Regions:
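Catalytic binding pocket for nucleotide-activated donors in carbohydrate/polymer assembly enzymes
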Residues: 196-273
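Donor nucleotide-sugar binding/catalytic pocket of nucleotide-sugar-dependent glycosyltransferases
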Residues: 96-106, 114-129
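Active-site proximal beta-strand in glycosyltransferases
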Residues: 50-81, 98
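A conserved, positively charged/aromatic
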Residues: 86-95
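A short hydrophobic beta-strand element within the catalytic core of glycosyltransferases
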Residues: 188-189
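Conserved catalytic-core segment of nucleotide-activated headgroup transferases in glycan assembly
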Residues: 17-18, 124-178
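Aromatic "clamp/platform" in nucleotide-sugar-dependent glycosyltransferases that forms part
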Residues: 193
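N-terminal pre-catalytic "stem/leader" segment of glycosyltransferase-like enzymes
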Residues: 1-62, 277, 281-290
Length: 290
């Protein structure tokens, strides 16, 4: 298939005791390359393709030593870093940047002036779990970077329906505890900020748990000047569950969702779009593109 040099530093995620996004990207990438039998080297230039996963200052210095023709960079790029200007001003320094999803690509193009044809969407692969669901309660609430009053409204709603729930807050769980909680839930209620990929949410899908998502429409993390259309579920289709945006749509959306709760197939969605096989193929396409 091809052979890749991966560049990353564990210090990039070392501040975090629990699993986090940047660490998970590397972990899942290694697992997917192993599964698909793609040879790789770590932090040495041994093969033709260079994949620089983190473009912090260390990554920036590393970049200056690499063969650039077959170099792709991302998904960990912070657009507000001074050294990122180098990438914009010198598109010949890399084959492509990678973004985890379309809205992030749109952000780079519309707000930071990057050329559309120098950016490729590449989500990291999601494990396809062979779990037997063991349902012991109704709803797992996944709550991250949203307002307390929104969480309270959802809890009140679930109480009014006599549905039991447990809550998982971002950063507050180990991986095994998280998987057990997910596997025991009948469904998941997602109250989430914007996600560039949403790996934890996709793991919930991959375990076959349907989701009702209270989505949002914009990225406002850096204020008005950088406002762009965005979402908490960048990878989604009707097999995954139901979506609403305003609290007054909750009752109607939930009624529909709950009536067809056994007809969703989130696991099938992951297998078709985000499996290790599919995402490694996508990565090799980016490297091999003309």
């Amino acid at each position: 298939l091809g052979m890749i040099n991966l560049y990353y530093s564990e210090a990039y995620w070392g501040h975090s005791a629990t699993m986090n996004g940047p660490h998970k990207v590397v972990k899942n990438l290694l697992m997917s390359l192993d599964q698909e039998k793609v040879d790789y080297a770590i932090n040495e230039e041994k093969y033709k393709f260079n994949f620089l996963l983190q473009y912090d200052w260390t990554g920036h210095l590393k970049h200056s030593e690499l063969d650039l023709e077959h170099c792709i960079i991302g998904p960990q790029i912070w657009m507000f870093d001074e050294h990122v200007k180098d990438l914009k001003e010198n598109p010949s320094y890399y084959k492509s940047l990678v973004t985890p999803s379309q809205w992030v690509k749109d952000l780079y193009v519309s707000k930071f002036g990057f050329s559309e044809n120098k950016i490729s969407n590449w989500p990291v692969g999601i494990e396809t779990f062979n779990n037997e669901r063991d349902i012991t309660y109704d709803c797992l609430i996944y709550f991250k970077r949203r307002e307390q009053k929104e969480l309270d409204a959802v809890k009140q709603f679930l109480d009014s329906k006599n549905l039991t729930y447990k809550m998982v807050e971002y950063g507050g769980y180990g991986e095994d505890g998280f998987k057990n909680l997910v596997n025991q839930a009948k469904f998941c209620f997602l109250i989430n900020g914007t996600e560039s990929q949403g790996i934890a949410v996709q793991e919930i899908m991959s375990m076959g748990v349907p989701i009702i998502a209270w989505d949002i429409k914009e990225w406002l993390d850096q204020g008005e000047a950088y406002r762009v259309p965005a979402t908490s579920i960048p990878y989604w289709d009707e097999r995954c569950g139901e979506v609403f945006f305003n609290i007054d749509e909750l009752e109607e959306t939930f009624t529909k969702f709950y009536a067809t709760i056994n007809e969703y197939d989130p696991k099938g969605f992951i297998e078709d779009n985000l499996s290790f096989k599919k995402t490694v193929e996508k990565l090799m396409e980016i490297f091999n593109a003309d």
